[in-house]
Amino acid sequence: LNRIQFVLLRLCIMKISCPNPDCKQQLSGPKSYIGKQVACPICGFEFIWTDFFRSTCSFVIYDLETTGLYPDEDEFIQIAAVRYENGCLAAEDMFFSFARPRRSISSFIESYTGIGNRHVAGAPRPEEVLCRFSQWAGEATLIAHNGKRFDSKFLAATCQRHGLPTRQVDCIDSIHISKMLFGNTRGTGHSLDHVKSRLGLRETNLRRHDARGDVDILGRAVVSMSQRLGLDPSLNGVPRHQTMLPRV
């Protein structure tokens, strides 16, 4: 190899540690491995190859309820979150707020979420709530179910719509954890209800599609799936994406 070829080859190679806490073998592989399931040649531990192997053990599991499906048009009307650190839920450290949107909540959304205009009357605007949430969450990695396609987009859209100064935040979509555990689900998908059923989790005392009820289920699901997969407290091996939160 000439010098240029050698440099290009090195740029295509990445090094990570095996996410198995009992192994931690240094592994090398091409960047084309990212997103693929591989096995450590030393211990045999299977994981998703990713360039987001971190040492942080601090996470925030959250859920949004919104006026609709479109981040560019709709707003969130409720947010709930709980801290998840070192493999454990910190049930005493939670965040919750309604948010008052600029459009009326439709009867369909009220029937779906249980949240109507009377619940958000007098609540702060979504951008105010998001600033408070950002301050509370700190540098934690965010976890949401279907977060990459939905929740993360609403966070970023809220920041952009109101011209807020922003910071990038690492995120995990818990659907990826479900896929790592359950693989091909033969068309039944990885909805939160299906995940709850597969894990045999008890029903929540809170309403489904209320952010508090969904976070209660998702928090227990993340704990259960992580334990079954043998993931380390940093959830190494689970793909990450990024969103934006207000810089406060």
What are these regions (language model features)?
Residues I13-C18, G35:
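Flanking scaffold residues of small Cys/His-coordinated metal-binding clusters
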Residues C18-N20, C40-C43:
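Short cysteine-rich clusters marking metal-coordination/redox-active sites
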Residues D22-L27, F47:
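Cys/His-rich microdomains that often coordinate metals
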Residues G29-V38:
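Short linker/helix segments within small regulatory modules
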Residues G44-D51:
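Short Cys/His-rich micro-motifs in 6-15 aa windows
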Residues D51-V169, G189-H209:
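Conserved non-catalytic scaffold segment of RNase H-like nuclease domains
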Residues I172-G189:
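Short alpha-helix plus adjacent loop in nuclease-associated cores
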Residues R198, G219-V248:
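Acidic two-metal-ion nuclease catalytic site recognized across multiple nuclease folds
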